[in-house]
Amino acid sequence: MAKKVQKKLPRRKEEFTYHGYKIDELRAMSLEDLLPVMPSRARRKVLRGWTIGEEKLLSDIRSNGSRIRTHQRDMIILPEMIGREIEIYNGKEFIRVELQPESVFHYLGEFALTRRRVTHGSAGIGATRSSKFVPLK
């Protein structure tokens, strides 16, 4: 009569792969070896060359700086950046973002949104015709 209760095992998170490459394999590749793996938009940006700001950001990441703040929203997330915390400027403040393996070859700006959703409140007194005659307290 006693039923055996099976414990649900936690789901095993599979290791992230990008086009069949694990993140460690992507990190070991040189930039020239990464080009065929990249999406075309990221590949064209890399082939154009880095700007001065992007080169500075890459050197900061490679030098293991503890706090990295940047305005370079159009920088491609490279495999060597994965696992780092970067603060990205959204026009008003710096948004702290931890770069996950799933974000490889995306732009930094995709993770620090510049606009927020508008939440309208209720209408004020006198805003509608029916609320003109509501007695004020």
UniProtKB/Swiss-Prot annotation:
Pfam families: Ribosomal_S19. One of its GO terms (cellular component) is cytosolic small ribosomal subunit. It comes from Methanospirillum hungatei JF-1 (strain ATCC 27890 / DSM 864 / NBRC 100397 / JF-1). This is Small ribosomal subunit protein uS19. GO terms for molecular function: rRNA binding; structural constituent of ribosome. Protein S19 forms a complex with S13 that binds strongly to the 16S ribosomal RNA. The keyword Cell inner membrane does not apply. One of its GO terms (biological process) is translation. It comes from the Archaea.
